[in-house]
Amino acid sequence: KDILCVISIASHGIYMEIFQKKGNIIKIIDKAVHITQIGKEVLLNHKLTFNKIKEINEVIKSMKTAAEGYQVEKIIVFGTTAIREAKNSDYLQDQIKITSGLDLIILDKLEENYLAYEKISVALEKGIKDYNEKNNLIIYIGSGNVSFSVINNGINIYNTNIEIGSLVLSDISNKLNLSDKKRNIVID
């Protein structure tokens, strides 16, 4: 059947996509989203609370059950910046393994950026006729960082990363007691 499920634990929620491959075409056949503030909690506490770990586990188990309804061949669970930055991410990995039997892969910055750029590049290739024949700058603004990638004729030739993202900027503006107008300027 060539069906795969990918679950991403990110700063603003937990996301599931189920993909099916038919020939050379890969199609998303289902999606699910659970919104929760993981990144903000880690930014403030440097760890995940017991309740947040419990919530993440319950959502992962629920998404696994939904994916099994499609008879998926494999379920991949990965964590991004918020999970990587949590001091107790190893405990979360253990709990997910115990409760759902799934392995949580915590992506490093380079892996996370690579996947983001690949997804962006595929979208740009579809939307811009001669995308692979030009020089392009892709800026990826995440909740924990801002990344830049230079693409030359379809090949990624340079990457750099700044450790400040939307959550950090929001936290700074809160600490400075900025008005809404000034806060939006800082975050923009």
Predicted regions, residues:
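Gly/Thr-rich phosphate-binding beta-strand-loop-beta motif of the actin/hexokinase/Hsp70
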Residues: 1-28, 126-162
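Active-site glycine-rich loop that binds ribose-phosphate moieties when present
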Residues: 122-126, 130-131, 164-166, 185-188
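Short beta-strand-loop/turn "lid" adjacent to the catalytic site in phosphate-handling enzymes
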Residues: 66-94
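Short, well-ordered amphipathic alpha-helical segments that serve as non-catalytic structural scaffolds
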Residues: 54-66, 188
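Active-site neighborhood for divalent-cation/phosphate handling
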Residues: 76, 86, 93-141, 146
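Short glycine-rich, Thr/Ser-proximal phosphate-binding strand/loop in the N-terminal lobe
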Residues: 12-50, 153-185
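Phosphate/oxyanion-binding active-site loops and adjacent basic polyanion-contact surfaces
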Residues: 52-56, 109-116, 183-186
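Phosphate/pyrophosphate-binding loops at sites that engage ATP/ADP/AMP, CoA/4′-phosphopantetheine
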Residues: 61-75, 125-130
